[in-house]
C-alpha cells in the first residue's frame, strides 16, 4: 500500500473514495461538515434517515454524492464526540479499512486523522492509520498456487491533516507507522512460513539479509561455535533434529560508543514436536509458531533500523528444532549449561527455557543496560491471561514499568506476574542444580523463575507471548506481537 500526507479540502479530492467521520447524535466531524456543505445538505439528510448511528465502527458507503469529486464517500462512526479515545479511534479505523476491502486497486483519501483524540497528537493519529491499514489488509498467500479470488482493496491511501502546518507532524507519523508496520509484517511472514521452509538456517539467512538491507551487524554462530561456548543446555535440545542449530547475533549500533546496549533475546524453536515427551497430534501444526519470539526480535530490528533509532541494541536468537530421534535428549538426562549450572530434564517439551538460558548467559558479554527475552514459553500463561495480554516477569521494577507503559502506549499490552522466591523450590532436583519444570501449579511463573537463575548479572525482563503471538481458528496466523511493544520500549529508551 502506498501512503501519503496531504492538507486540503475533502470535496475536491478526485479519489475512488473519501473517508470522513461522524459522531453520535447526528454530528459531523469537520471534514464531514465540509462535504455536507458541498453537497447542499445531502449528508445531513442521510444521517436523519438513521442509516448510520455514529457509534464506533459503524459505516455507510455512499455513491456519487452531489458536489463531491470522489466517486464514493465512506461515513465512519466515531462515537460520542467528547468521549473519542484511542480505543474508539482505532475501532473506527479498522471498520473503515474493512468496509473498503471490496474496492479494487482503489485510491482513497482518509480524513480521520484530523479528528481530535484525547491526549494524542497528529503524528500518533497518522501512525495509527498506517499501522491499522497494513495490519487489516495483511495476507499470507505465498503457498497459494492461485491468487485468492477477490478485490485488491486499497492501493493508495492519502492521509489528510487539517492544516499545512500539520503536514510535517503528519509525515513524522507516516514514517513511524510505516516502520512499525514493516517490522510487524516481517514478523508475521516469518511466523506464518511452513516449518519445512522456516528452518534455523532460513532464519539465519533472513537475519543476514536484514543486516545487508538495513546496515546492521550480524554474526551467525554454527554448531561448532556453540559447542566451544559450552552451551550444553541449548545443544541438548538440538540433538534430535537433522537441522543444524544457529545462534544469531544482530547489532544495531546507532547510539554513542560508550552506551551500553539493550539486549533482546528471542526463542527460535522453528518446530516443536515436544521431543521424546511428544505432544498430542491435534494442533501440532501450530508449533511452527514456536519461533515467534525470534520473529519478533527480527521484526523489531527492522522497525528500529527504519526509524534509525539512536540506540545500541543487540539481538540474540538461539534457533533449532525440537524433534524425537534416537539421539534426542531423554527425560532424566542432565545437561550442563553455559553458566555451569546443571539441569535435570524432566520433560523435553519444556525446551524453550533450555535454549534461552544459554542465550541469557551469552548476553553477559555485552554488559547490557537491560535484557528482555521474548518467548512462546508456556501454555500456562495462556490459561492465566488468555490472548489479550503477554505475561511479563522482571527482576527490576523500573524495567517492568517501562515495558508495561510501552505496551499500553503501543496497544500491545502486557500484564506483570510475580517472580517470588517462594516459587523457586518447585524447581528443586535430587540429581542436578535444578529441574527444567516445576509441576503444573504456576507453570508460567516457574518457567520465569528458571530463566531468572541465568539473568542475575543485569536488569532482566521476560515476555511470555504464548497467548499473543498467533491466532487459531478462522483467523489462524501470526500476529506480529510484541513488535509494537518492543519498538515503543526502545523508542522511549532512545528518547524518541
From Swiss-Prot:
Subcellular location: Cytoplasm
Key words, A-Z: Aminopeptidase, Cytoplasm, Hydrolase, Manganese, Metal-binding, Protease
Annotated InterPro entries: Leucine_aapep/pepB, Macro_dom-like, Peptidase_M17_C, Peptidase_M17_leu_NH2_pept, Peptidase_M17_N
Chief location: cytoplasm
GO biological process: proteolysis
UniProt-annotated catalytic positions: 279, 353
One GO CC annotation: cytoplasm
Binding sites annotated in the UniProt record for Mn(2+) 2: 267, 272, 290, 351
Coiled coil: none
UniProt EC number: 3.4.11.1, 3.4.11.10
Catalytic activity: Release of an N-terminal amino acid, Xaa-|-Yaa-, in which Xaa is preferably Leu, but may be other amino acids including Pro although not Arg or Lys, and Yaa may be Pro. Amino acid amides and methyl esters are also readily hydrolyzed, but rates on arylamides are exceedingly low; Release of an N-terminal amino acid, preferentially leucine, but not glutamic or aspartic acids
Cofactor binding annotation: Binds 2 manganese ions per subunit.
UniProt binding sites for Mn(2+) 1: 272, 349, 351
Enzyme class label: hydrolase
GO function term, MF aspect, one: metalloaminopeptidase activity
Cofactor list: Mn(2+)
Annotated function: Presumably involved in the processing and regular turnover of intracellular proteins. Catalyzes the removal of unsubstituted N-terminal amino acids from various peptides.
Protein's UniProt name: Probable cytosol aminopeptidase
Amino acid at each position: 500500500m502506498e501512503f501519503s500526507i496531504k492538507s486540503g479540502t475533502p470535496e475536491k479530492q478526485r479519489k475512488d473514495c473519501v473517508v470522513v467521520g461522524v459522531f453520535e447524535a447526528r454530528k459531523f466531524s469537520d471534514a464531514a461538515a465540509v462535504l455536507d456543505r458541498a453537497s447542499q445538505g445531502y449528508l445531513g439528510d442521510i444521517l436523519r434517515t438513521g442509516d448510520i448511528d455514529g457509534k464506533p465502527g459503524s459505516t455507510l458507503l455512499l455513491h456519487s454524492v452531489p458536489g463531491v469529486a470522489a466517486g464514493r464517500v465512506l461515513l465512519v462512526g466515531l462515537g460520542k464526540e467528547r468521549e473519542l479515545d484511542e480505543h474508539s479511534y482505532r475501532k473506527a479505523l479498522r471498520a473503515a479499512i474493512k468496509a473498503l476491502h471490496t474496492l479494487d486497486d482503489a485510491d482513497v483519501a482518509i480524513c480521520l486523522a484530523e479528528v481530535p483524540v484525547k491526549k494524542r497528537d497528529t503524528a500518533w493519529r497518522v501512525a495509527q492509520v498506517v499501522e491499522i491499514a497494513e495490519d487489516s489488509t495483511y495476507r499470507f498467500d505465498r503457498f497459494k498456487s492461485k491468487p485468492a479470488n477477490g478485490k485488491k482493496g486499497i492501493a493508495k491511501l492519502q492521509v489528510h491533516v487539517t492544516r499545512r502546518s500539520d503536514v510535517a507532524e503528519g509525515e513524522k507519523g507516516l514514517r513511524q507507522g510505516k516502520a512499525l508496520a514493516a517490522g510487524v509484517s516481517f514478523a508475521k511472514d516469518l511466523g506464518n512460513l511452513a516449518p519445512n521452509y522456516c528452518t534455523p538456517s532460513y532464519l539465519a539467512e533472513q537475519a543476514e539479509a536484514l543486516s545487508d538491507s538495513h546496515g546492521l551487524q550480524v554474526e551467525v554462530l554454527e554448531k561448532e561455535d556453540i559447542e566451544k561456548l559450552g552451551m550444553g543446555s541449548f545443544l541438548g535440545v538440538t540433538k534430535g533434529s537433522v537441522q543444524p542449530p544457529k545462534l544469531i547475533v544482530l547489532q544495531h549500533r546507532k547510539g554513542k560508543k560508550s552506551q551500553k546496549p539493550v539486549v533482546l533475546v528471542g526463542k527460535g524453536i522453528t518446530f516443536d514436536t515436544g521431543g521424546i515427551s511428544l505432544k498430542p497430534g491435534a494442533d501440532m501444526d501450530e508449533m511452527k509458531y514456536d519461533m515467534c519470539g525470534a520473529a519478533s526480535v527480527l521484526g523489531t530490528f527492522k522497525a528500529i533500523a527504519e526509524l534509525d533509532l539512536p540506540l545500541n541494541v543487540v539481538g540474540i536468537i538461539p534457533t533449532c528444532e525440537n524433534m524425537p530421534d534416537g539421539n534426542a535428549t531423554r527425560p532424566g538426562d542432565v545437561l550442563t549449561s553455559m553458566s555451569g549450572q546443571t539441569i535435570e530434564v524432566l520433560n523435553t517439551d519444556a525446551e524453550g527455557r533450555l535454549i534461552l538460558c544459554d542465550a541469557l548467559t551469552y548476553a553477559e558479554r555485552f554488559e547490557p543496560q537491560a535484557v528482555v527475552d521474548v518467548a512462546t514459553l508456556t501454555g500456562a500463561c495462556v490459561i492465566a491471561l488468555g490472548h489479550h495480554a503477554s505475561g511479563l516477569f522482571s527482576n527490576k521494577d523500573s524495567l517492568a514499568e517501562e515495558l508495561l507503559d510501552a505496551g499500553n502506549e503501543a496497544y500491545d499490552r502486557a500484564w506483570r506476574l510475580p517472580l517470588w522466591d517462594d516459587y523457586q523450590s518447585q524447581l528443586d532436583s535430587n540429581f542436578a542444580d535444578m529441574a527444567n519444570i516445576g509441576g503444573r501449579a504456576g507453570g508460567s511463573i516457574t518457567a520465569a523463575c528458571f530463566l531468572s537463575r541465568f539473568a542475575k548479572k543485569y536488569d532482566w525482563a521476560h515476555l511470555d507471548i504464548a497467548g499473543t503471538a498467533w491466532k487459531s481458528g478462522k483467523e489462524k496466523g501470526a500476529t506480529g506481537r510484541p513488535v509494537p511493544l518492543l519498538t515503543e520500549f526502545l523508542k522511549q529508551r532512545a528518547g524518541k
